[in-house]
Amino acid sequence: MLKVNIVRVNKNAILPRYATQHAAGMDIAACLDVPLTIQPSETVLVPTGLAVELPEGYEAQLRPRSGLALKYAISLPNAPATIDADYRGEVKVILVNLGQEPFCVNHGDRIAQMVIARYEHAELQEVEELSRTPRGSGGFGHTGV
């Protein structure tokens, strides 16, 4: 199992945890002194009170929680958000209220999922043209909707 160092930069922070044995993402919670209300169409930055030290070659991806998206239209506008291995600051989550009603976030509310993922740097090679495929340049619904 991959070891990731984590620090509570706020003593009241709640450590992320996997909700089930086979969950890909850990639930990550808000760390707030007072409740935060997100108005419809408003975007806010929510602190978690945590900082992580990821091994080289790994990133942490922050993703929306499906229940918040379905029930309240609360999402992450930059999903998946990336936390790089060399970042040492507090993890914060950008939330947007796409719904019609104000949404209140309280301390300890699970606001996102954090997935630890391996990545590789690519070496780009400029060429005159790309190899041909049956699909070609078809995209944006070319196989139907």
Curated annotation (Swiss-Prot):
This is Deoxyuridine 5'-triphosphate nucleotidohydrolase. Substrate binds at residues 65-67, 78, 82-84, 92. CDD domains: trimeric_dUTPase (cd07557). Keywords: Hydrolase, Magnesium, Metal-binding, Nucleotide metabolism. Belongs to the dUTPase family. GO terms for molecular function: dUTP diphosphatase activity; magnesium ion binding. It catalyses: dUTP + H2O = dUMP + diphosphate + H(+). Its EC number is 3.6.1.23. Pfam families: dUTPase. Its cofactor is Mg(2+). The gene is dut. SUPFAM superfamilies: dUTPase-like. Pathway: Pyrimidine metabolism; dUMP biosynthesis; dUMP from dCTP (dUTP route): step 2/2. GO terms for biological process: dUMP biosynthetic process; dUTP catabolic process.
